[in-house]
Curated annotation (Swiss-Prot):
Gene3D superfamilies: 1.10.530.10. Residues 89-156 have a biased composition (Low complexity). This is Probable transglycosylase SceD 3. CDD domains: RPF (cd13925). It is found in: Secreted. Is able to cleave peptidoglycan and affects clumping and separation of bacterial cells. Keywords: Glycosidase, Hydrolase, Secreted, Signal. Pfam families: Transglycosylas. Residues 1-27 form the signal peptide. It comes from Staphylococcus saprophyticus subsp. saprophyticus (strain ATCC 15305 / DSM 20229 / NCIMB 8711 / NCTC 7292 / S-41).
Amino acid sequence: MKKTVVASTLAVGLGVTGFAAGNSADASEQGVDKAQLAQQAQSNPESLNEAPVQDGAYNINFNYNNTDYSFQSDGQYWTWSYGQGSTNAPAQETAEQPQQVEQPQQTEQASTEQPAEEAAPQTEETQQPQQEATTQTTSSSNESTSNESSSSEASEGSSVNVNSHLQAIAQRESGGDLKAVNPSSGAAGKYQFLQSTWDSVAPSEYQGVSPTEAPEAVQDAAAVKLYNTAGASQWVTA
């Protein structure tokens, strides 16, 4: 299961902003109850989306019952994730402290590294926050995600080449509706971006406005950019 920052089912996660949380420390070194954190991640993920596990910056990583857990914060943004048998923490999403309410996301971990995909062309270069790079190497996953070199084709009404996997994600998240809005999470647009996620991948002229205000080509390009940099695990249903 993987937490992220964008969607209804969308990885509540289309949202990706990275940070450095300092030196990693085992849970026992910080006086953290591993069993309690593991149970909270498995059975009450909403509470982890609403608030960090403790005040200030922290970087807690541990293995409990053959499952890896990671909880990080730089004092302003916080992330958490878990996955079975992973030697590295899954790609992580961040949430901005008092604002976004995020939903849990299933950890999608393939047995091979995801092939790099060619980024779709963009009319403007936007600055994207630095993101922690992690390699997914686990051989077991909650769902089987196969990023084969699937054929890419432009979405109807858009000149951006969107691979078939990302097209399927858009159908699950919004049915392809550019104006779709999730009333509970605030995720919006064809790919159900949270606002903080959208601002990290959208062109500068569309940052700070709802994804629903952007044309399909802009939404497609932003989703491709997020998919190529952070992977399909940004969507819960991916």
